[in-house]
Structure formats: C-alpha cells, structure tokens
Amino acid sequence: MAIKAYKKEMSQIINLLKEDNVNLRSIKKLLKEFYKNEFNFNSKYYQGKTLLHYVIENNCETIIPMVINYGCNPNICDDSYMTPLHMAVTKGNINAVKMLIKKGADVNMGGEFEQTPLHLAVICGNLKITKLLINFGADVQLVDEKNLSVLDYAKDEKNNIIIEYLRKKFNIQKGEE
C-alpha cells in the first residue's frame, strides 16, 4: 500500500475517532474494509502511534478487540515509549485496561523511564487499576531506571491506601521495604 494512501486512510479513522459523537458503525465498517485490503494495523502515524494508540486516546475501547484481531500488536510503543496499555492506565480507563490485557498486552512492559503500567497506576493513584494489574500478573518488584519500585512511588505520592494494599497483599511489614 502506498504511503500516501496509508496516511489518508489513517487520517480518515483518526478523524472519526475524534468526533464528539463517535459513529462506531462507520468506524467498524471502515476497519473491515481496511482489513480486506490488507491494511497494516501496526503502521505508525504521528508521534509513532498505531491505530490502537488512537483508539485508546479517544476512549473508543469497544473496538479494541476488533483492532487487535485485525493484527494490531498491543505491545508497540509510540515515540514516548507508551504502549496502548500505558496510555489506558494513565487515562484511568479500566475497561480498556481489561480488554488490552485479555488481548495480550504485556503488564510488565517498561515504557518511558522503564516504568511499567503498574508504576503508572500507582503514580496516578488508581487503586482499582493497581489491583487489576497485579491480579493479571504485574510484578511489584520491577524497578524503573531510577531503581524505584511501585511501593517507592506510592510512598512518594503519599498514597496510604495503595501502600497499605501492597503491604497486606504481599505481607510486607513496615521497615522491611
């Protein structure tokens, strides 16, 4: 597929995703057409984002399974080293987080500064997403490039609810961390 045609097709979908009243029927129809024409769903557009990044960015989580089933890899990073899962976590979109994980997103993948989705959930103070990621195998012992763990970030953010959850869940005594 020619680059100009690809950019035109991506622009079409991105513009539809950005509409206030997103017409999911139109988007799904267009995605099916692109799939039939062997559109590369892993191609990157502006700032290195794939179609899946734009789906997350515009809160259209209902089409996540379709985009992934058509071949979009949920573990591709954009130019800011964010996967769609990192984006969904920072947006606090728990439904998107669930769908991405169920469709193969890596819960332990390091992004910018080697921060995992769990690091970001803790930094954002989102206990529900923190619990969800841990239940799906997120490793609480992974550290970022500053050698900081999720517990370190919970302490930095003074998030006592997440600190207590982590201590109880992993039987960590005060002073042991």
Predicted feature residues:
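Intrinsically disordered, low-complexity regulatory segments in ankyrin-centric signaling systems
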Residues: 1-58, 65, 69, 174-177
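Leucine-rich solenoid repeat scaffolds
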Residues: 140-173
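Ankyrin repeat structural motif
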Residues: 23-33, 60-68, 93-101, 126-134, ...
